[in-house]
């Protein structure tokens, strides 16, 4: 079992990654709102977050720290960041003329510190010469003889080891932003933007889906060598499609649900499966029915849990489904008459079920045209014996489902 210190480090590391993902998504949203389409964002590429807008590159280092932490001139957060950028600049992996280097930290910047002097120009505190002097002084005064901080100092020293010194150039590209929003504040900001896009009631559900897509997309980018970043065009397409799903006349259909392929054997005792067996539907089609039932049940439950449905909406939808079925069922019973054979009953019952399977495409909302919603909802009704296929479905299944002691 991990000790308390190890658990804390693991939790802090996990929170750091979540903060990184959340900030990257927030950056995409900001770019989408303000920068048109000519941009891209990548995570864990050249830096925590790598942002391109036109020909300009922004490399972001993120540091989430506990309240009250200060970014001093000997802070490991500061020097580890400097090491990353110094090594990249020295190796020619970044073009300092076209690259902005941003350190975003939730820590405070003590007045007069190097970080304080490297705030953006509009802060009116920026003083690159003083920042460089402070960093050199901190490095010189340090008594560190080994460890991570020493290697950070060495990387910074190497910038000025050649005929072309780079320390001053590097410093000129760095901006430090202290007291930046933490993961909670970043998510609150995104939730506010989501509320503006789709309304307050649907904002959480909208943001959850956008986050789900983005995290999957970033994982794909990180797992693939040279993986492509999220582009402005791609993000616009995803966001526009998601907004369309949350319109007044629509409901979202989720990919994890459309991909469900349940085990048919687990539903063998369900009443709607027995209804299909009663009329001789084959095992393959029963499998499709189970799939539609599970998908519809899961999607409807999620809509309900997320308060995306209007009062009485499911009841009204099911009323329409039952009434459409009832007229066809009555017509079937009328055509068969009281003397119909079992073979004739099954034949006509299959026609009713074929109508559900191939034609019944009643939409819960005008824009929600996913087929499994209607088909699966009919199976949900069949499971409750509110609809059926065999002319005698109610009597036969009630007898079958009745406890043995009650017969």
Tell me what each language-model feature is:
Residues 1-11, 64-364:
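Acidic metal-coordinating catalytic centers involved in nucleic-acid phosphodiester chemistry
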Residues 2-6, 11-18, 22-29, 376, ...:
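Basic, amphipathic N-terminal segments that precede the first structured/catalytic domain
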Residues 13-14, 20-83:
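Catalytic centers of nucleases
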């Amino acid at each position: 079992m991990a000790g308390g210190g190890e658990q804390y480090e693991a939790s802090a590391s996990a929170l750091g990654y979540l903060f990184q993902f959340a900030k990257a998504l927030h950056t995409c949203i900001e770019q989408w709102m303000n920068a048109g389409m000519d941009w891209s964002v990548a995570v864990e590429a050249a830096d925590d977050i790598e942002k391109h807008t036109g020909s300009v590159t922004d490399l972001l280092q993120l540091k989430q720290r506990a309240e009250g932490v200060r970014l001093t001139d000997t802070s490991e957060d500061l020097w580890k960041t400097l090491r990353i950028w110094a090594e990249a600049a020295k190796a020619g992996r970044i073009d300092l003329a076209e690259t902005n280097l941003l350190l975003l930290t939730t820590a405070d910047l003590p007045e007069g510190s190097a970080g304080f002097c490297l705030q953006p120009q509009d802060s009116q505190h920026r003083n690159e010469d003083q920042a460089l002097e402070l960093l050199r002084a901190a490095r010189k005064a340090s008594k560190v003889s080994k460890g991570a901080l020493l290697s950070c100092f060495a990387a910074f020293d190497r910038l000025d080891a050649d005929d072309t010194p780079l320390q001053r150039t590097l410093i000129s590209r760095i901006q430090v932003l202290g007291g930046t929003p933490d993961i909670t504040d970043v998510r609150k900001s995104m939730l506010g933007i989501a509320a503006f896009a789709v309304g307050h009631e649907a904002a959480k559900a909208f943001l959850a889906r956008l986050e789900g897509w983005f995290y999957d997309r970033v994982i794909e980018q990180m797992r693939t060598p040279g993986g492509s970043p999220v582009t402005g065009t791609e993000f616009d397409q995803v966001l526009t499609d998601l907004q369309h799903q949350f319109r007044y006349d629509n409901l979202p259909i989720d990919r994890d649900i459309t991909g469900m392929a349940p085990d048919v054997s687990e539903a063998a005792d369900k009443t709607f499966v027995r209804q299909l067996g009663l009329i001789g539907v084959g095992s393959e089609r029963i499998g499709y029915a189970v799939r539609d039932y599970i998908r519809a049940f899961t999607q409807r439950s999620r809509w309900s849990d997320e308060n995306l449905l209007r009062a009485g909406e499911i009841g009204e939808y099911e009323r329409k489904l039952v009434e459409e079925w009832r007229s066809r069922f009555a017509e079937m019973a009328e055509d068969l008459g009281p003397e119909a054979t079992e073979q004739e009953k099954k034949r006509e019952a299959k026609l009713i079920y074929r109508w559900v399977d191939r034609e019944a495409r009643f939409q819960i909302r005008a824009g929600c045209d996913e087929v499994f919603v209607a088909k699966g909802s009919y199976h949900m009704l069949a499971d409750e014996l509110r609809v059926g296929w065999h002319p005698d479905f109610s009597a036969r299944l009630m007898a079958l489902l009745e406890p043995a002691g009650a017969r």
